Amino acid sequence: MKKFKSFIALDLKSNTQNISIVKKLYLHVYGFKVGYRSFYNNRSNELISEIKRSKCKLFLDLKLHDIPNTVSSAIDSLSNINPDFLTLHISGGKELSLIHI
Protein backbone atom coordinates (compact mmCIF):
# COMPACT_ATOMS: atom_id res chain seq x y z
CA MET A 1 0.00 0.00 0.00
CA LYS A 2 1.35 3.44 -0.91
CA LYS A 3 1.98 5.76 2.01
CA PHE A 4 1.54 9.45 1.17
CA LYS A 5 3.89 12.04 2.67
CA SER A 6 1.06 14.02 4.19
CA PHE A 7 -0.40 14.85 7.58
CA ILE A 8 -4.05 14.49 8.51
CA ALA A 9 -5.42 17.17 10.84
CA LEU A 10 -7.23 15.72 13.84
CA ASP A 11 -9.24 18.74 14.90
CA LEU A 12 -12.63 17.18 15.51
CA LYS A 13 -14.42 17.88 18.76
CA SER A 14 -14.75 14.19 19.59
CA ASN A 15 -11.59 12.21 20.29
CA THR A 16 -13.58 9.08 19.46
CA GLN A 17 -13.88 10.44 15.92
CA ASN A 18 -10.21 11.46 15.85
CA ILE A 19 -9.11 7.99 16.99
CA SER A 20 -11.35 6.41 14.37
CA ILE A 21 -9.59 8.48 11.67
CA VAL A 22 -6.16 7.34 12.92
CA LYS A 23 -7.24 3.68 12.81
CA LYS A 24 -8.60 4.05 9.27
CA LEU A 25 -5.79 6.10 7.70
CA TYR A 26 -2.53 5.28 9.48
CA LEU A 27 -1.33 2.97 6.70
CA HIS A 28 -1.71 5.74 4.12
CA VAL A 29 -0.24 8.85 5.75
CA TYR A 30 3.05 10.13 7.12
CA GLY A 31 1.56 11.54 10.30
CA PHE A 32 -1.23 13.23 12.22
CA LYS A 33 -1.52 16.84 13.35
CA VAL A 34 -3.12 17.43 16.74
CA GLY A 35 -4.25 20.99 17.42
CA TYR A 36 -5.56 22.88 20.43
CA ARG A 37 -9.06 21.47 20.55
CA SER A 38 -7.99 17.86 20.30
CA PHE A 39 -4.92 18.16 22.54
CA TYR A 40 -6.68 19.89 25.41
CA ASN A 41 -9.58 17.46 25.30
CA ASN A 42 -9.80 15.43 28.50
CA ARG A 43 -9.13 12.24 26.52
CA SER A 44 -6.13 13.42 24.51
CA ASN A 45 -3.89 10.76 26.09
CA GLU A 46 -5.88 8.10 24.25
CA LEU A 47 -5.46 9.95 20.95
CA ILE A 48 -1.71 10.47 21.42
CA SER A 49 -1.29 6.79 22.38
CA GLU A 50 -3.16 5.66 19.27
CA ILE A 51 -0.96 7.81 17.03
CA LYS A 52 2.18 6.44 18.71
CA ARG A 53 0.90 2.85 18.27
CA SER A 54 0.34 3.54 14.58
CA LYS A 55 4.07 4.38 14.15
CA CYS A 56 3.06 7.57 12.30
CA LYS A 57 4.63 10.95 13.04
CA LEU A 58 3.01 13.16 15.67
CA PHE A 59 2.76 16.89 14.93
CA LEU A 60 1.58 18.92 17.93
CA ASP A 61 0.23 22.18 16.54
CA LEU A 62 -0.04 24.07 19.83
CA LYS A 63 1.42 27.33 18.51
CA LEU A 64 3.67 27.88 21.51
CA HIS A 65 4.24 31.60 21.88
CA ASP A 66 5.31 33.46 25.01
CA ILE A 67 8.49 34.73 26.60
CA PRO A 68 11.43 32.36 25.98
CA ASN A 69 11.54 30.91 29.51
CA THR A 70 7.83 30.06 29.45
CA VAL A 71 8.03 28.45 26.01
CA SER A 72 11.05 26.44 27.12
CA SER A 73 9.11 25.20 30.16
CA ALA A 74 6.15 24.27 27.97
CA ILE A 75 8.42 22.27 25.68
CA ASP A 76 9.95 20.50 28.69
CA SER A 77 6.47 19.53 29.88
CA LEU A 78 5.72 18.04 26.45
CA SER A 79 8.90 15.94 26.41
CA ASN A 80 7.11 12.89 27.84
CA ILE A 81 4.89 12.91 24.74
CA ASN A 82 7.93 13.17 22.46
CA PRO A 83 6.26 14.83 19.45
CA ASP A 84 8.05 14.57 16.12
CA PHE A 85 7.02 18.11 15.14
CA LEU A 86 5.93 21.10 17.18
CA THR A 87 4.72 24.58 16.19
CA LEU A 88 6.84 27.25 17.80
CA HIS A 89 6.33 30.97 17.17
CA ILE A 90 9.68 32.68 17.52
CA SER A 91 8.50 36.28 17.47
CA GLY A 92 9.19 36.28 21.22
CA GLY A 93 12.83 37.08 20.52
CA LYS A 94 16.17 35.68 19.45
CA GLU A 95 16.29 33.40 22.52
CA LEU A 96 13.36 31.38 21.17
CA SER A 97 15.33 30.46 18.07
CA LEU A 98 17.98 28.92 20.33
CA ILE A 99 15.65 26.52 22.17
CA HIS A 100 16.60 22.90 21.59
CA ILE A 101 13.69 20.53 21.43
Residues covered by each model-derived region:
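Conserved N-terminal beta1-alpha1 strand-loop-helix module at the mouth
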Residues: 1-95
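Conserved small/polar residues in nucleotide/adenosyl-binding loops
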Residues: 99-101
